[in-house]
Amino acid sequence: MRTTGLLLLGALAELGSATYILEDDYQPNTWFDQFRFFSAKDPTHAYVNYLDQAEARSQNLIGVRNNAVYLGVDHKNVATGEGRSSVRLETKKVYNHGLIVADINHMPGGECGTWPAFWTTSSAWPMEGELDIIEGVNQQKQNDYALHTAQGCSIPERGDFTGSVVTPNCDVKALGQAENQGCLVEDTKGSRGYGPDFNNATGGVFATEWTDQAISIWFFPREDIPKDVNSEHPDPSKWGKPSAFFGGGECPIGKHVRNQRIIFNTAFCGGWADGMWPGDPICSKKAPTCMEYVRENPSAFEDAYWSINYMKVYQQGTAPTKPSQAPAPPSSTPALPTMKSTSTVSSMVSATQPAPTASNPTGAPMQPSSSSSNNGPQPTGGNGNPGDSCPPPTQPACRTYVTTKTYTLVSTMMPSGPQTTGGIVPVPSAALEDIKDTAQRLRRRDMERHSRRGHHN
């Protein structure tokens, strides 16, 4: 049957889209509550004394300065014992996958003897991997991205990324590569991504997307940071080519990188920086060894500090989207076959009519009962009670006919618009009256057919 109004037969489902949703927000005012302080002996044999939180605070090596996290080193005293005092912070939380976004104003680096890093690793190294997002030694100019794994992971030497692959095998024991070198990608954006030039340009953002298939790392200088990087739902697909890419068919990331903590630290000398010292034309002239230079020159490391605006970790999920607004519907139902929906409505239709007489040969009903099956049959019998469709017993006996009918309603579903509330489209009163009138006509027709054919109860 047709109606001239719009009918609402169901609520519109809220749509959602797969995107990144914020899981952990590392801000300066809560930063030190979310990290643990590593204070054991450095595993890379660095000349460094890592302090616990209380001692680091007492020596003013940590804090919040200019609304940013400050992580510094001792730059006032000649080093003794295990080395120059510094800090190594690791997230209390362990991660598997995610989007890690860090906004950094200033980093250590560019000074002889320093070995700063922003990285992730697992307690089951190298089986569960290590990822270096920022790392360098001595007077290095460009940032190095690296992945360290067990055997069975190699990356393509060319691909959809901007960096330059130095070594392709991520295995820390790979033949033909330095021990623990892993797969190394050098940033080709010049010196803006590391050390003094990074600091002079007020830093930038490092964003790392880690999935089962691949790890991609972007570096954005301050003036090139995408608008959505610090939004509720950042979208890496809009950021262009990453600086580094680890993955592909020769490296199942889901197998090799798991259970990672995020780490910031500043070390001195150690395996990498020590090894580079003799061949460094500038550093090697300052002292015979890296350790001697770091020990005797505290003021050289005043600028060896991290200043971090924030770090955020996102995970993929489904974010709700609001239904779009639509113009007010027209006064009559338009022909929109792509939006058409049908609903089958079954109900018990009950009506009472007088028996056929000379004055009423068809026995047409005097008044229909409710059109809703929820109300049930109305009282019958000709007593004059409320709801009785028969007049008082001055006429012949009444007969009650009950028919069961199934109707199919065809309606046009329209999006919610300004005239709606909460996405629910109201049914115009004119449309409801249409339904009632049509239902009455159908009942009269049914009663006439029953009467002619002699069907009654």
From Swiss-Prot:
Sequence ranges of Polar residues compositional bias: 353-362
Organism from which the protein derives: Arthroderma benhamiae (strain ATCC MYA-4681 / CBS 112371)
Main subcellular location: secreted
Subcellular localization, as worded in the UniProt entry: Secreted
Glycosylated position list: N200
Record GO biological process: cellulose catabolic process
Protein name: Endo-1,3(4)-beta-glucanase ARB_04519
GO CC annotation, single: extracellular region
